[in-house]
Each structure stands twice: as structure tokens, then as C-alpha cells.
Amino acid sequence: MAQISLTFPDGKAREFPAGITPAEVAASISTSLGKKAISASVDGRHYDLQWPIETDAKIAIHTMADEAQALELIRHDLAHIMARAVQELWPDVKVTIGPVVANGWYYDFDRDETFTPEDLGAIEKRMKEIINAREAVKTELWERARAIAYYEERGEPFKVELVQAIPEDQSIRMYWHGGWQDLCRGPHLQHTGQVPADAFKLMSVAGAYWRGDSANKQLQRIYGVAFKTRDELKAYLHMLEEAAKRDHRKLGREMELFHLQEEAPGMVFWHPNGWQIYRTLEDYMRGRLRQAGYKEIRTPQVVDRKLWEASGHWEAYKENMFIVEVEEEHAKEKRINALKPMNCPCHVQVYNQGLKSYRDLPLRLAEFGSCHRYESSGSMHGLMRVRGFVQDDAHIFCTEDQIESECAAFIELLSSVYKDLGFDSFEIKLSTRPEVRIGSDEAWDKVETALENAIRKVGAAYEIDPGEGAFYGPKLDFKLTDAIGRKWQCGTFQVDPNLPTRLGAEYIGEDGAKHRPYMLHRAILGSFERFIGILIENYAGKLPFWLAPRQVVVASIVSDADPYVAEVVAALRARGVRAEADTRNEKINYKVREHSVGKVPVILAIGMQEVEARSVSVRRLGETRTESMGLDQVVDQLAADARIPG
């Protein structure tokens, strides 16, 4: 029998018969590993324990201790178990697809009746019965004709269509347990009992079109979440409850920050309070960029298609652009313009004005650029996903040798900004060269090394995402962690030698010859709209004092105190504090409660005692106790708190 060589993570290699399965490999190492094994990685591919290995390969055996692989298998198996449970409860239901998604899975079903909350409970119960039965999960390769005949016989048109879409020279892999079969690439666990029965929950039902096309039949999508332990599930459900309380759409109404409406889908109507947050954040970012050596510019929002064709965006991005046709005098054809979906081609136009020398580099151009992208109506979500937004966008034009230092400076700036805004931890992911790419391996080596050196220079941790860079260069993605543990991808740093070439950007080098600069696309917030949504949810509306739209409300207890209230408000405003008076004929407790709902950080209550002592009674948001302070003292303190960081 032919032999193959399998190399393990420790670098040691062993000979095995060709066709051996990972399950057999695990058992050959130790009885314990044979029992604990759930899957393998073979040459980087996630591999079922039942699949044969025919050639030399690198292999790693996975157990439940391997978080990523374990969760993928648990969630994938639950998709199958749920689909089986649904068809056992309602045999007429047709099945389609059921992939793993973030935190869980979904499966799409064709059913005439709508799934109810009671139905979800019945499905969960049947799923737990299947899990507790510890039924073996088996797999087999079928010929295409056999798979089509199998699904046609059972009246499963969606599965027939899926099989027919698979190339004719490929075999069809089937998985089954308890007599229920599904078309699937795998891998899966070895028996249903390996799925934790107390660590999953069916969450919701939503509509979904077959293959995502609104021209096709509408299906019902059941979502589920799953984890390795019951405690992890409880923690996740608690996080969802907390997230619901912090929902920026709900708080946006309570704090009178913004609204959206059908006449302008995906476009934000900022109210005075929300616009104040926006402007304060913009002023903060403008100051930080100025300190870091950026020059602010402004470019047009409506640009002729010729520029988008030259940049390559027209071909690749046209479907997501807002097109504007204009009839101009004496023109034979209509002029076709587009609202810019990104700022980079316009920034190259600014760079191209006037001859540049190597002495002018690095040149850092920043813009709070207004962009528009056509997002599908189903994908829009409050401030988090909109069609009209403003980026804290900047592009650095530099030489290859300057990439490392510019990247390091950017990471330090980003880290400082996030810290000022209340985010002390973030993750960095380095996406490296894809298979299809431009440029030489030597050029990619230099740039990827420059980014890694920059990250190490600032002492940050990072992970590599192999093959996920753009076709023209590697990139860094920055994910911050909020107060309830959610991760948000906001910052980016993208190396681009392509756009300067397409749009003719040049500089004169030390050798007197013309060279192409590198263009570094970078953002810290991403978009103001989305980042403000993140801030609102991170702080549950209780924004830092300097960022709060209404920083202080000075409330009278009796009408005789109104003149002193006006004096206090004037003193605070003179020192840059956003202060308002509340002299309505309402009880002080009512005023305090109302302004607390509006998330005002400080309420100063004033009665005759405070008038006579020229003091104020200070109540801070979230606290029940009050503190008496002299007028000059409270003005000095609040003026200091109101200063924008940096």
C-alpha cells in the first residue's frame, strides 16, 4: 500500500497508509486524542475526521479546546439538526441553505405558514432530542445524477437547483444522521451528542429571497446562536439585552439627536443636539490631524464619470453610485456625473496640481469628505449603515521608504484618539497578498514587512489574515472593543501603488527622474455617522462631558431664583460650557428626571439658599447625592471638563 508523510505542528513527520482518515491519525497518537478529536486542518483546510488523506500534507488535530474550529462545527451541525427538526415537525416544508454566520447560523425554509414563537420553541425541543440521541453523523460522496434523483424524488426543488449548479466533474458530498440527509461540503462533528444541548437558542424569523434575488420566491429564515457552554450563551443573551437598552436609535429619540425618514432613505436629519456632537467630534479630529501634520482640503461632491472611469471605480463600483445626468448648453450628449462614493480619486487631483519633489513627501491630505453610496434598503440600520455619510478621510503620498514611519505614526495617532474617546483596547489585523495581485513578490515583501515593523515599533499586538489584502497592496484593519464587549471595525490603513499610477501622480526623486508615489489610504473613525452611533451605544448615551451636546442645565427651584439662574448660565457660557436654563414652573424632581432621561451630565439646582450663598447644588448624571459648590469654583471645574482633549 502506498505511504504518505504527514507533518505535525511540532515539525515532526510520520508515515501513514494513503487514504488514512484524521480520526485514525488521532487514535494512532493516543487513545485520549482519538476520543477528543473533532476535526483536523490538512494543508490549512478544515477537514472532517472521516475524510481520507491521499497525499503528503501538514496536519493538525482539533479538539473542543480549539475555539474557532469547535464553534464552526457546533454551529454548522446545529443548522443541519434544526433543518431536520423542522422537516420532522412539518414534513411539507422545503429546505434550502443553512450557513454558519457570526455567533450562530441560519437556515432558509419554504413554508406556507409563518413560523411563530411557539414553533421556535417546538423546534428547539426537537433539536435537543436529536442531540441527546447521540446519533452518528455520516458522510458519503455521490454521483451528480444520484443526488438529483434523490432530491427530485423527495420534492426538494431548491436542493435540485443547488446540485445542478455544481460543476459536472465534481462529486456531491452528502451528510446524514437519523435518516435525514443534506447536501453539504462539511466538515461536521462525529455524532449529534457532541453539540452542547444547553448552549444554543433560536432567536428570530426573517424574510429572505431565494439566492438573495427579489425576483425569486420569498423564504423564511430562522436564526440561531450557539456557543460552547451554557454560561457563554447566557453572557451573549445578556449582552443583547444590554445592547437593546443602548440602541442608538432609541437613545437618539430620547436625546433628540437625529431622525431618518422615507423621503431621504439612509440620509441623516441631524437635530441641534446631534449636530453639536458631530461638530464637537469634527473639531476634535481637526485639531488632532493638524497636530499630526495633515493639511485639510475640500473636494467636489459631484464629479464627471471620466474621473471614475480613469480610477477604475466606474467599472467596479457603478452599481453603488448615485448617477446624475445633466443637459448642458451646446453639448451633444448629456453629461454623466456621480456623487462621489469615496474621496481618493479627488485627492489625487489635488496632489497632481503642481510639480512635486521628494522633498514635498510625505504629503498628508485630509478631508471630512461627504460621500454617497447606494446601500440596499434591507442593509441600512440607523446611523450604522447609511447612504450619505462623512469620512474622516486622509491620504498620505509618500515614498516606499516612508511607509513604515507613516504607518507607525498613524497607529500611535489612532491609539491616542481611541483612548480620548473611551476605547482603551483595539485589535489589528494585517491582510496580506491575495493570489490574484499586481506587483512583484519583492515589492509585496517590502511593503508587508514595513507594516509589520511599524506595528512592532509601537508595541501593538496583531494577527495576520492571509490572502485578504487588496489586489494592489496589503492593509491594516483596526477593531475597537466597546463597553459590552462588541467589536467594531473602524480604522483602516491601506497601501496603494495602483491609483497613483492610474491617475498619473508623480514626483521628482533625488536622482532627478520621475517616480510614482505610494498612496496610503487611512481613516480612524471610518464615518462620523457610524462612529457617533458607536459612541452613543458605548456610553449608553452618557457621553463624556466634553462631547455631550447639552453639558449643563441650570434649573430653578423657585421663580425668585430665575435672575441668578440666568447669571450662572451666562458665566458658564462665557467659559465655553454648553449651558441651558430651565425656569419652567415645574417641580425640581420633575426637571431632574426629564434631563436625566436626556442624558445631561450635570444639573445645577438653584433655590433661594443658593442665591443668598452665591452657590449651586450640583447633581451629576447617574448619582443620587448632590454637592454644594461656590459659583466661581463650579464654573472653573466645568470649564476645564468642557475642553476638547488634545
Curated annotation (Swiss-Prot):
A Pfam short name: tRNA-synt_2b
Q: Where is this region: Catalytic?
A: 247-544
UniProt: Zn(2+) binding residues: C344, H395, H521
Gene Ontology cellular-component terms listed? cytoplasm
Biological process (GO), any one = threonyl-tRNA aminoacylation
Known catalytic reactions? tRNA(Thr) + L-threonine + ATP = L-threonyl-tRNA(Thr) + AMP + diphosphate + H(+)
Record has ATP-binding as a keyword: yes
Give residue ranges for domain TGS. 1-63
Question: Where does this polypeptide localize?
Answer: Cytoplasm
Gene3D superfamilies in the record:
3.10.20.30, 3.30.54.20, Anticodon-binding domain, Bira Bifunctional Protein, Domain 2, Threonyl-trna Synthetase, Chain A, domain 2
Main localization is: cytoplasm
User: Which protein, by its recorded name, is this?
Assistant: Threonine--tRNA ligase
The cofactors required by this protein are: Zn(2+)
Looking up PROSITE patterns in the UniProt record yields: AA_TRNA_LIGASE_II, TGS
Q: Alphabetically list the UniProt keywords.
A: Aminoacyl-tRNA synthetase, ATP-binding, Cytoplasm, Ligase, Metal-binding, Nucleotide-binding, Protein biosynthesis, RNA-binding, tRNA-binding, Zinc
Subunit record text: Homodimer.
Q: Does the keyword Ligase apply?
A: yes
